[in-house]
Amino acid sequence: MPIFKKTLIVLSFICLISILIYLNMYLFGTSTVGIYGVILITYLVIKLGLSFLYEPFKGNPHDYKVAAVIPSYNEDAESLLETLKSVLAQTYPLSEIYIVDDGSSNTDAIQLIEEYVNREVDICRNVIVHRSLVNKGKRHAQAWAFERSDADVFLTVDSDTYIYPNALEELLKSFNDETVYAATGHLNARNRQTNLLTRLTDIRYDNAFGVERAAQSLTGNILVCSGPLSIYRREVIIPNLERYKNQTFLGLPVSIGDDRCLTNYAIDLGRTVYQSTARCDTDVPFQLKSYLKQQNRWNKSFFRESIISVKKILSNPIVALWTIFEVVMFMMLIVAIGNLLFNQAIQLDLIKLFAFLSIIFIVALCRNVHYMVKHPASFLLSPLYGILHLFVLQPLKLYSLCTIKNTEWGTRKKVTIFK
């Protein structure tokens, strides 16, 4: 990134944080909201500060036998074909490309793939297509490929994702460090222009990777290697394959949360990192109902795998601390909102209510300050995501926690992304 853009981001962040500190301390002082504000500002400064120091891995990747694994379930046919083409176009050679259909009721996509592979024999010699007779879930679809490959490195790609031609090559640069066992790339919404929801989702993704994972990568402990574009050493996958397929939580089988589960296996062995130069675009829900179902699944996975991460406090305290911070921030926000609604609202202190909303707006701008130089107009929509986060996603997160034993969340139904 050019130096003037970095300078603009840093100066903007300092200005926003200064306003945030003033609003928080002057209006809320030592109240519950004020205490939450102090912790939030501290956490923001730590994350943004670390992300400013982040640098991607450089050098030339070593020679590896790499297998790409693409599980699919009721996927849009053209979307899956575009995914395969993007994997075939990688600048780093792949030994095997597995496309595993997980018992889809709509077979249009896998039929199109089979026709393409049979027609384009020269470029698809290393493509292995498999149809499962029954739907067992993404983990079992991936496992079918893992069990049959002798690859040194596994590349995981979601079936609705376009990965840039140099994505694998860039990811593998991180493996020049032998202590790194998993790496993830940078994710954006392919259908960002569809509507307001997809634009807000793209803003959130850019923050989740460009800030959160960049900060965590600096400590060598990103919490989630994202499914659309990640690599794992063989030592992460194969010894844990049975655990992966048969994971249970509170006595019930687990079928979702595969990304975080594999990341936890990698954390047990060494470092997990983010490579900003490895990029991909993925389809995101454009309907609120589908979006909330997705968030519910992710929330339950977050809480389940957070318990596992916190248990690592002795063996890997940094991972535990990152996780504890995320959980504590969620809990404190719920308490702060409750205090504001049942205390300040009763007193009809409209100034403080307005100040609280202003803080939410400014926090949203602070979180997404990197986005300012990428899409300036869309950056101004960040406060809308702040409102969505506060009034929709936080209550949903609480609901997810309260219903974490409900197994219905484990069923992922594919939705059409484009009309």
UniProtKB/Swiss-Prot annotation:
Gene Ontology cellular component terms for the protein in this record: plasma membrane
Its keywords, alphabetically, are: Capsule biogenesis/degradation, Cell membrane, Glycosyltransferase, Membrane, Transferase, Transmembrane, Transmembrane helix, Virulence
Q: In which pathway does it act?
A: Glycan biosynthesis; hyaluronan biosynthesis
Presence of keyword Signal? no
Q: Which reaction does it catalyse?
A: [hyaluronan](n) + UDP-N-acetyl-alpha-D-glucosamine = N-acetyl-beta-D-glucosaminyl-(1->4)-[hyaluronan](n) + UDP + H(+); N-acetyl-beta-D-glucosaminyl-(1->4)-[hyaluronan](n) + UDP-alpha-D-glucuronate = [hyaluronan](n+1) + UDP + H(+)
Its family remark reads: Belongs to the NodC/HAS family.
Q: What does this protein do?
A: Glycosaminoglycan synthesis. The hyaluronic acid capsule is involved in the pathogenicity of group A Streptococci; it may be the major virulence determinant.
Query: This chain belongs to which protein, by name?
Result: Hyaluronan synthase
